């Protein structure tokens, strides 16, 4: 009886803390220089219009997004008007962190502006090409979005 009661108390105290803590996951990250262009028309990306689109949220070019150049494609954006359009991700590589706004689809991991990858890699985006990062979805306010 004592063992069951202690187990129940431990579970009641421990579980809420562990389930409330977001866990970071690992994925690939690469760059595409077309995201470096602040005049990139959002009408040409997966997250263009529709209820979840960036244009609907008031942004017409990549440069208008508050945390530009930290924008790019995300594997979580599967199709046009995805509910993951405009999501903010905390992306970390070797103790460097950026907050990335998902505006497009990526077949694998994240595909972001070279300038943004240079921030993560201390200017080594071109040399490294593709890296492993940890990421987690965070509040959109961390990307400067409403």
From Swiss-Prot:
Keywords, comma-separated and alphabetical: Glycoprotein, Secreted, Signal
Signal peptide segment: 1-20
Major place of residence: secreted
GO cellular component, one term: extracellular region
Stored SUPFAM superfamilies: Barwin-like endoglucanases (SSF50685)
Entry's localization field: Secreted
Keyword Acetylation: no
Entry keyword annotation includes Signal: yes
Domain of life: Eukaryota
Post-translational modification, as annotated: Glycosylated.
Family recorded in the similarity comment: Belongs to the cerato-platanin family.
Name this polypeptide is given: Heat-stable 19 kDa antigen
Species whose genome carries this gene: Coccidioides immitis (strain RS) (Valley fever fungus)
Taxonomic classification: Eukaryota, Fungi, Dikarya, Ascomycota, Pezizomycotina
Gene: CSA
């Amino acid at each position: 009886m004592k063992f069951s009661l202690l187990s129940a108390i431990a579970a009641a105290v421990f579980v809420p803390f562990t389930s409330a803590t977001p866990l970071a996951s690992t994925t690939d990250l690469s760059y595409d220089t077309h995201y470096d262009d602040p005049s990139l028309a959002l009408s040409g990306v997966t997250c263009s219009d529709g209820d979840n689109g960036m244009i609907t949220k008031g942004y017409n070019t990549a440069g208008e997004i508050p945390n530009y150049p930290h924008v790019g494609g995300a594997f979580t954006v599967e199709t046009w008007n995805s509910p993951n359009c405009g999501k903010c991700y905390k992306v970390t590589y070797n103790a460097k962190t950026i907050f990335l706004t998902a505006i497009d689809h990526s077949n694998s991991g994240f595909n972001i502006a070279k300038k943004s990858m240079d921030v993560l890699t201390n200017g080594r985006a071109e040399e490294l090409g593709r890296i492993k990062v940890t990421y987690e979805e965070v509040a959109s306010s961390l990307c400067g979005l409403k």
